[in-house]
Amino acid sequence: MGHSEEMIQKAIAQENGKVHVNAQSIPEKYQQKRADEAGVIEHIRYPSKDYFLAGKEITKEANVYLPYGYSRDKKYNVLYLMHGIGGDEAEWGMVDEDSLVKRMMDNLIYYKEIEPFIVVTPNGRSTENCAREGSDYNSFYVFGKELRSDLIPYMEAHYSTYAVEGDPSASRMHRAMAGLSMGGMQTINIGIGECMDLFSYFGAFSAAPTSNLAEKTAKILEDTPYTVDYFYNICGTEDEIAYDSAAAAAKNLPALCDKLKESDNFIWQELKGMHDFHIWYLGFFNFAQIAFKSVSYTHLRAHETGRNL
């Protein structure tokens, strides 16, 4: 669907490059591994189908961050965090105690910047062969079926969330979707494009070139009865892969859609940077502080709660 092999390989190479996160972007105290009050990462396997091919029953894998003190006696918001075209459920690093996503979450919670919530990193390819290499990239585009029919129901059956039985839309304000590159495309095309009844918070980090154009997203938002609590975007100005597409997908949305208002429930953040984790970790750090704020901190305006915006 519009991918050139050269662009794909370039995106994969940049995704897999080693990154030293700049402490000026994400304060050092949020990057530290906590010796106390630390959450845990669980690895899950859940039943699904090969939605790209013949609908064969398969098993998919994902990683789940549970905040410190997680209890079945409490209810938690859930962020579904998507990877890029060269990654899988492990690309965000949520595989062990050294995960930067985990460290940021642990510290944001410890310093009371956010209320505790769950983070899920699934494999965004909805097909049996969902490996980093050798899989069909078009399987990214049917992930919405797996998300709706398999992953969200599994999470809500096995973890303590705000799920309302028989009515997923009743708890949409307790779910968020975000992702890097191809995962940013999935957030726009699938999260907003197909699943507004399931989510109300969205984050696109360097959204991929096949993301819906702003005009299409604006029409979707105008036609849906659901509102957007927040749509956060970030992209590097030196990103040769995604800057033009990400800007075309989101930058002018408030001018096209009455449901999005700059600094109220929408932000476009661009800064010097390329198509890599310098941008994406900062995107996660910022979005983690924006998501669920109207739920957890109703007395604060969303634009007052972000960092480095």
Annotate each PLM feature.
Residues H299-A302, G306-L309:
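Single conserved hydrophobic/aromatic residue that forms the stacking wall/gate
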Residues M1-R301:
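Non-catalytic cap/lid and distal C-terminal segments of serine-dependent acyl enzymes
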